[in-house]
């Protein structure tokens, strides 16, 4: 019975975009880890986005007509988004801020698009017919984890793209890997921020939404083409806008 599958890809991505924007606004106006209900609620809503993005990167791998162009497009927007990500988090302090690890050694040195792009590469490795050895594939995937580590959500997002692709069509297995990887990720926060470590598991809120996916991008080809580029462009543009508003003190800050 599939009557409940009422959402196409465009609709789910739009939900993810709204959730992401709410989350990023929360980081901007409620800096740090405040234990207040409003920023916590906003961050819980925002946890919907990452698994949804991983899911659709994996779906894109199976639907794209040219995986090489798809991969290049992902890395191009990873580069563009890196600058927007730094501006959003730190404002504009000079060109040095765009160099990873120049100012600090925090885990998130670039945007989640970097980790998603490497997740796509993981899928390509896993499904490659040119790489015959399972050991070689495992080694390459481990190396990709290291390369993707500096991105937002670390290598967790990359591994989730791989898991969503590997277990495509089996939502319960995808959910298990989601809980496992994010649980490990949240555990790293546990010693100094238990509330926000636990909050990461709100990613499971994405599962009921993904259950409604009908397997289609949308019904209007022209609108689909527009939305494809809208999703790519919105991410860096909204980050840059938040960063500019922060830099010029045009956003209220609640501490």
Q: Which residues fall in each region the model found?
A:
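Alpha-helical transmembrane segments and their immediate juxtamembrane cytosolic regions
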Residues: 1-255
């Amino acid at each position: 019975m599939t009557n409940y599958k009422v959402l196409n890809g465009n609709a789910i991505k739009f939900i993810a975009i709204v959730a992401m924007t709410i989350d990023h606004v929360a980081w901007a106006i409620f800096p740090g880890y405040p234990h207040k209900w409003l920023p916590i609620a906003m961050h819980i809503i925002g946890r919907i986005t990452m698994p949804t993005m991983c899911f659709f990167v994996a779906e894109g791998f199976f639907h794209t007509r040219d995986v090489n162009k798809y991969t290049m497009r992902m890395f191009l927007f990873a580069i563009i988004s890196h600058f927007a990500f730094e501006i959003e988090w730190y404002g504009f302090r000079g060109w040095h801020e765009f160099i990873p690890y120049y100012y600090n050694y925090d885990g998130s040195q670039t945007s989640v698009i970097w980790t998603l792009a490497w997740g796509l590469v993981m899928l390509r490795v896993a499904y490659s017919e040119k790489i015959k050895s399972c050991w070689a594939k495992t080694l390459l995937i481990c190396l990709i984890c290291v390369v993707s580590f500096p991105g937002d959500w670390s290598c967790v997002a990359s591994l989730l793209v791989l898991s969503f692709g590997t277990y495509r069509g089996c939502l319960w297995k995808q959910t298990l890997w989601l809980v496992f990887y994010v649980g490990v990720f949240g555990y790293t926060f546990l010693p100094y921020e238990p509330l926000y470590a636990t909050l990461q598991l709100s990613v499971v809120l994405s599962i009921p939404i993904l259950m409604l996916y009908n397997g289609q991008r949308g019904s209007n080809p022209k609108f689909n083409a527009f939305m494809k580029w809208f999703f790519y462009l919105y991410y860096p543009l909204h980050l840059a806008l938040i960063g500019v508003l922060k830099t010029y003190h045009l956003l209220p800050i609640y501490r």
